[in-house]
Amino acid sequence: MPHMIVEYVFDPPATEEELDAMAERLDPCLEGRDVRFVQSFVSLDRRRRICVFDAADADVVRTAYRSANVTFERVWPAELISADD
């Protein structure tokens, strides 16, 4: 399944409680659409976040986020390029 990248920008910076609340709302919406969380990166200043999901396409992820009322900057498909390649 392809990787989908979700970008966020937080102003003011996101708190741990806010990130947890987003995940609680989002998880059921992702599961119902066959979207699997892979990993997440949060900037040290807590103003940016990138999440990686396995999903059929970007529209499925966007729909899940909108259903959960979780804002995002953009969603785009990606492929992994690693040092092992």
Which functions belong to the PLM regions below?
Residues 9, 52-54:
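Short hydrophobic/aromatic beta-strand micro-patches
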Residues 55-81:
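An amphipathic, aromatic/His-enriched active-site/gating alpha helix that lines ligand/cofactor pockets
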Residues 1-32, 36-38, 43-47, 80-85:
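Short S/T/G/P-rich N-terminal loop/turn motif that feeds into the first structured element of a domain
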Residues 48-49, 74:
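Basic side chains
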Residues 20, 54-55:
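Short alpha-helix boundary/capping motifs
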